[in-house]
Amino acid sequence: MNSTRLVYELCDIVNLYLCQPGVQIDVDRCASGPHVFTKGGTEAICTVKLSHGLVYNIEFVYKFWAHKLESVKYPFSPCFIISNNGLATTLKCFLSRPRNVNHFGHVLNIDSDVYLTKNTSVILSQDDFVKFKTNLVFSKDLDVFHSMVVFRTYLIEHRQALQFLVVKPRSSKRVNSILSSVAKTASQNFILDPPRRSEETRVCIKPWTLSKKNIWTIILSLVAVVAIILKWREL
């Protein structure tokens, strides 16, 4: 896959799924180039300026990125960093753990309540979501289809805080039914037109063939939609 197109698609995932439909987020996309794909690269693919009072679907977007990078045989796992530099609280999305993590200040662990004072950060990688959910859900419910980590922002003048939550669908049977229907479709071979990209990206994506290779992407997309329809409940 063309590197520029990959950067566009990863940024589209953030734009489409980080918040609920209709919520506009401030995303700054980096200029693509070989430097962003090197191990330990210090430039984020995109930076999101976080806003007060919103819920961010952080685990869903992370897992979507991880799948996308795996599908193009990228050898490293993504790394997301939430930080407060005193001027703004941002989410930076990297293709791998940057070598200059100290630049983001004192690192705090993901927890139910995180007070993100000036020059502190939360670094999220592959295992952090499972570790956070371990004490909150049964082991059979740790995957993203049965539970997801989200965070809510409290960003006011004298308080910069994040509340990490685990949400589950109210009707797991309905979720399983929808996912089963999609899985059955995977055995068929037809052309599927993906949703149009946002006008800001101005990227024209050609129709692609539905197969077992890309069924995971479709299922993840449906999970996001199902989460909205079924109104995920907090644990």
From Swiss-Prot:
Localisation: Host nucleus inner membrane
Keyword Coiled coil assigned: no
Perinuclear space membrane side: 1-214
The UniProt record lists the keyword Magnesium: no
Pfam family, one: Herpes_U34
UniProt-listed HAMAP family: HSV_NEC2 (MF_04024)
GO cellular component, one term: host cell nuclear inner membrane
Subunit structure: Forms a heterohexameric complex with NEC1.
InterPro entries in alphabetical order: Herpesvirus_viron_egress-type (IPR007626)
Function: Plays an essential role in virion nuclear egress, the first step of virion release from infected cell. Within the host nucleus, NEC1 interacts with the newly formed capsid through the vertexes and directs it to the inner nuclear membrane by associating with NEC2. Induces the budding of the capsid at the inner nuclear membrane as well as its envelopment into the perinuclear space.
Domain of life: Viruses
Family affiliation: Belongs to the herpesviridae NEC2 protein family.
Membrane topology: Single-pass membrane protein
Transmembrane domains' residue ranges: 215-232
Protein name as catalogued: Nuclear egress protein 2
Post-translation changes: Phosphorylated.
Keywords, comma-separated and alphabetical: Host membrane, Host nucleus, Late protein, Membrane, Phosphoprotein, Transmembrane, Transmembrane helix
Primary location class: host cell
Intervals, Nuclear compartment: 233-235
